[in-house]
Amino acid sequence: DTAMTYDEAMEYLGKITQKKTDKTASDKKQEKSVDKKEVSAGNAGEVAMTLPEDLPESFTMSSGVGAWASGINIKPDGTFTASFHDSNYESSSVSSGSGTFKNIELVDKYTYTMELDTFTYDDEIGKEVSNDNGHITTFTELYGIAGGTTFTVYLPGAPTADMPEGMQRWLGFHYYSVPIPEALDCYAIYNVDTEYGYFNTGLQ
């Protein structure tokens, strides 16, 4: 047997994954934990310039199915490095690079938005290398970063019911063995355009 590839894992999980919650959507609407009044008009929408100083550096995107993962190491000033790998018995796909985010903006006390400014790959997309055993490694685009312009950073305490549908799917992957909490208990980064989600803690 061989491990599922990234594409196979996404297809499989799309069929079996459903939102895990111990409350109905209507219950959650009535029990939102965020008090919007706690965020002053002077802070909401303010250009923050940097992310929180205590933001964890390392984030990972993984579904728990298949031999693939994508990661981001990010600094509060928006500079980052990223990588991706996917493998099976006969071949592997890898990617890596570095870049910067700009227009970091504080939305509310649990949420920042930012835009991808630059990203440079470490190697040429499509390049293939074969080892002595015939295993082929291909340098690909970086899943999780490629195709994205706008990214959202969620802080612990962010109400999960307010997050977009794409992020809800990754919450289901992340909290695969426990109910999705009403308030996020870790940090997360969400690619709004391609709907990919990263977390700073392992699958639960």
Regions found by a protein language model. Name each.
Residues D1-E53, N200-L203:
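N-terminal Sec-dependent export signals
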